[in-house]
A protein has these predicted regions:
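Terminal amphipathic alpha-helical/low-complexity segments used for targeting or macromolecular assembly
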Residues: 1-180
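Structural signal for interior beta-strand "rungs" in well-ordered beta-sheet cores
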Residues: 185-301
């Protein structure tokens, strides 16, 4: 085939891809001066946050008790600048998608800085709750040799730390950015935690791959999940146009001290009571009483 024939094929593809009907709902109209969220910068934000939350494990390995104040100060300053940039991008993306602004204003820049500083003020509390997650992972796994091994190696800690960062940003009203952050962890670990889920302290996921925690899930303290667990929705109420109604509670509530073993599927707005145990490979769509132990029915001989 001659180069001219190739040119014709390429030109035809360009024309078809440029038809408005072909990109309906898939095209973001970028406006001059509008920043866009950057996955690369958000990855740097996560790494900086981890270096602050887990000093010595991430970031500068030469940090010690004499220099920790300096290193955290430097990282906080970098984090603030990057957060301001990305939060602004999220705010502009959200408002432009809704058709409410053309170019991000000084007011939005000030709001981005306020939200960034508010997020940074939450880091001490975030470290405290992540410390309980590390403790739960260590205490719950006889194969764990140390807290350091848990922090360095366990995919659950990466996924949970991303979730806790994203959840705080979502609680502050930052659009889009929180979802990107949790999906980064999803891609890396296979653990899918929606940033809107509410999760208490001492939370751990053993092994982790294939876990799904839906947006309206509520998880109490000292809860342990194993690989392949789904906390999902049983059904979706529809609006007049037949589309799912968004924002309504549709995922399970797990009370304190619940254990859910591998590949269990728990669906709908049901309650798994305090101290209950859900066995592996079970489909649960009804409330489970406190202290109950739900396992597969044995096959009849």
């Amino acid at each position: 085939m001659s180069p001219l024939n190739f040119t014709h094929i390429l030109t035809q593809a360009v024309d078809e891809l440029s038809e408005s009907e072909s990109y309906k709902g898939l095209f973001h109209q970028h406006k001059d001066g509008e920043p866009l969220p950057s996955a690369k910068v958000l990855y740097e934000i996560i790494e900086l946050s981890r270096s602050i939350l887990f000093p010595g494990y991430y970031g500068n390995s030469t940090i010690n008790s004499r220099t920790i104040n300096y290193h955290i100060g430097v990282n906080i300053e970098k984090l603030f600048d990057l957060l301001c940039e990305q939060i602004l991008a999220g705010l502009c993306f959200g408002t432009n998608s809704a058709g409410k602004c053309s170019v991000c204003s000084d007011t939005e820049r000030e709001e981005a800085a306020r939200l960034a500083s508010k997020f940074i003020s939450k880091l001490p509390a975030m470290r405290r709750i992540l410390a309980t997650d590390v403790e739960a992972a260590y205490n719950g796994d006889p194969a764990a040799e140390s807290y350091g091994e848990v922090i360095f190696c366990y995919p659950a800690i990466k996924a949970i730390s991303n979730y806790r960062i994203a959840h705080e940003l979502l609680e502050l009203g930052v659009p889009l950015i929180p979802r990107i952050i949790t999906e980064m962890a999803h891609s890396e670990t296979g653990i899918d935690i929606h940033p809107a889920a509410k999760i208490g302290s001492h939370f751990t996921i053993d092994h982790g791959t294939g876990v799904v925690i839906g947006a309206t899930s509520i998880i109490g303290n000292n809860v342990k999940l194993y690989q392949g667990v789904t906390l999902g929705a049983k059904s979706f109420p529809l609006d007049m146009d037949g589309k799912p109604i968004k924002g309504i509670p549709r995922h399970p509530i797990l009370e304190d001290n619940v254990i859910v073993y591998s590949n269990a599927t728990i669906l709908g707005r049901i309650i798994i009571g305090r101290d209950a145990t859900v066995g592996g490979n079970i489909w649960v769509t009804e409330n489970v009483p406190a202290g109950a132990r739900i396992v597969q029915t044995k096959a009849k001989k």
